[in-house]
Amino acid sequence: MERQVRVSILWLVLMVGGLVHTVVEVMPLFWGESIAAMPQNEAQMHGMMAFSACFFFVLPGLGQLCTLYACKRWCAVLNAVLAGVMLLLNTSHPIMDLPGALLAQWFILPLVFLFNVILMVEVVKACRRKETHSCCAA
């Protein structure tokens, strides 16, 4: 399979992993349990929502765009930086979240971390080879 396709699929898997993580977190609502996080103020709540949106959608979305449509070397480097930031966040989040998390998160978060490590390896290999994507050949 072509590296561009593999990297694109891995970015999508990270996005889906974030969605599955979120869905599992809200599942206790079906049994009438409260899942409300109590921020200290409204600004903190908006900050948490903005961070979550960036973490689960914007970073992988930019990585996806770099993978599919960008053919320059700096885009490959940006893709590696985005994958590295995601890896850092996917490393720290389970450390903070797992001790009090639902049992299902113990399966989801390590798997998302594993996919992120594979993504990082693929992106770094692409940077080292300086390979061009199929969109550059035209």
Locate each region found by the language model.
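Membrane-water interface at the C-terminal end of transmembrane alpha helices
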Residues: 113-138
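Hydrophobic alpha-helical segments of membrane proteins, primarily the transmembrane helices
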Residues: 8, 12, 50, 54, ...
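Structural signal for membrane-spanning alpha-helices in multi-pass inner-membrane proteins
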Residues: 64-67, 90-93, 119, 123
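Hydrophobic transmembrane helix segments
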Residues: 13-58
